[in-house]
Amino acid sequence: MGMLVPLISKISDLSEEAKACVAACSSVEELDEVRGRYIGRAGALTALLRQISTIQDMDERKAVGSAANAACAALKLAIQDRESQLAREQLHSRLASERIDVTLPARPRTCGKIHPISGVIREISSILSELGFAVVHGPELEDEFHVFDALNTPEHHPARAENDTFYMTKRLNGRRVVLRTHTSSMQIRAMESNPNPPIKIISPGRVYRNDWDATHSPVFHQVEGLFVDKHVTMGHLKYCINYFLSRFFARKVETRMRASFFPFTEPSAEIDVKDRHQKWVEVLGCGMVHPAVLENVNIDPEKYRGFAFGMGVERMAMLKYGITDLRNFYSNKLEWLNHYGFCFTDILGRA
């Protein structure tokens, strides 16, 4: 009994001391320090376990070993329980600090807008598709034949002057290459690919002219239409234009045709509409396809006739939505784009 009572008493004291330290820990790091101090390799309880081998009496050795092992197991369990408790407290603290106030108003959902040019092109295309027009697209870099020659625009015509048209330095098949000045070039391509009408197409797209002010831009957009078939008349053209304008401006519009001149149509006309201030405003040009244009694409003008029309997308948007400066379309001002842009849901009904 010589070493039994002092050792067991020391084990009990160390166990109670360690449990008190565990209970006082406020972090995992402090728990790790207590674990090392008592049951680590150099810990106090570990040192007592090493002394067991020096006890000669087997019964005493067994009793001390049992007490020491029980103390170590109890301390490990206390540390484990305290770790779980600290984790719960930490979680509750984090949840309390991150709590969401459900009474706060939701953040407004911001979304992009469809650019007014894209929106108006879709709007125009949708209306004309109701009349059976198919949408076609073509190259913006064209040769002189499709932009000028085939459209009955001779070499000396002012539209072909270099101060109005962007010419490239390289040639294609011996012809000069230009940035197209109108989308009428697609009408030529459509008739070339289908020499046996009917042909009923519109060609929206970007065009280029050397001009820049409040009402002109070197890059702008057009939509041009073509209908070729037997027995096509100016009456068909007038009905088509009136239907389109009434649908586009969402009201019954009063129109007038003024005689004009375009090299690719004969007769030619410009269409005016009365605005809300009862003033006549020009909106587009049109006319019957010139017989020379039909001949240039191997369509018999004695058998077929057609009409064509063209409009500037920016101009149509300015007239409909009260936009005063064409340059705003390309200024990238977010406030302006948010005001005049189309929401996706606005486009669904027009697509």
From Swiss-Prot:
The keyword Phosphoprotein does not apply. The keyword Nucleus does not apply. Its EC number is 6.1.1.20. InterPro entries: aa-tRNA-synth_II, aa-tRNA-synth_II/BPL/LPL, Phe-tRNA-synth_IIc_asu, Phe-tRNA_ligase_II_N, Phe_tRNA_ligase_alpha1_bac, Phenylalanyl-tRNA_Synthase, tRNA-bd_arm. Mg(2+) binds at residue 266. Keywords: Aminoacyl-tRNA synthetase, ATP-binding, Cytoplasm, Ligase, Magnesium, Metal-binding, Nucleotide-binding, Protein biosynthesis. PANTHER family: PHENYLALANINE--TRNA LIGASE, MITOCHONDRIAL, PHENYLALANYL-TRNA SYNTHETASE. Its main location: cytoplasm. Pfam families: Phe_tRNA-synt_N, tRNA-synt_2d. This is Phenylalanine--tRNA ligase alpha subunit. NCBIfam families: pheS (TIGR00468). It comes from Anaplasma marginale (strain St. Maries).
